[in-house]
């Protein structure tokens, strides 16, 4: 733009242009957020496939089960219901050389806990668990009722039956 920044006119132009750019960024952010919320309200579910064990994006764009990974998820639920701890399950998977959802060698108890508490494995989805607080910093926050959440049942194929999922939740509450 050939702006001379050493005089007051140049500084004023830069200030105005940066304000316009920031406003454009805010507008785009609001439009994207609106689009996400519209999809949620319409019951359309998308999963973080790269870090989500047992599912991949199908040819039609919808979640489909990866049989080998789904079997690992079933084993985790089964072992927990047999009385094994998060640590014992994680150690078993690590010892067997099964990679984590992120592709790492070492399983952690947080990963096991996350799999056991994730409603998506029973074919349902709670959407908007987190939301973006500030479009500039991209800071997110756990949704504690500030924005609407959407719970969609039977939104995609289940790996775990709803009954088994509820048994695991009850067992977790007992422990």
Spans of model-derived segments:
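Conserved catalytic breakage-reunion loop centered on the nucleophilic residue
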Residues: 2-175
């Amino acid at each position: 733009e050939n702006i001379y920044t050493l005089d007051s006119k140049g500084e004023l132009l830069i200030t105005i242009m940066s304000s316009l750019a920031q406003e454009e960024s805010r507008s785009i952010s609001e439009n994207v957020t609106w689009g996400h919320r519209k999809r949620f309200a319409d019951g359309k579910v998308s999963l973080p496939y790269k870090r989500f064990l047992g599912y991949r994006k199908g040819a039609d764009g919808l979640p489909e089960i990866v049989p080998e990974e789904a079997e690992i998820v079933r084993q985790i639920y089964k072992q927990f219901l047999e009385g094994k701890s998060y640590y014992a399950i994680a150690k078993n998977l690590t010892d067997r050389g099964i990679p984590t959802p992120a592709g790492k060698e070492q399983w952690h108890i947080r990963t096991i806990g996350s799999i056991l508490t994730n409603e998506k494995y029973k074919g349902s989805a709670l959407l908007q668990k987190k939301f973006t607080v500030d479009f500039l910093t991209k800071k997110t926050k756990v949704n504690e009722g500030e924005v609407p959440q959407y719970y969609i049942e039977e939104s995609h194929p289940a790996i775990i039956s709803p009954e088994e999922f509820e048994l695991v939740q009850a067992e977790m509450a007992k422990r």
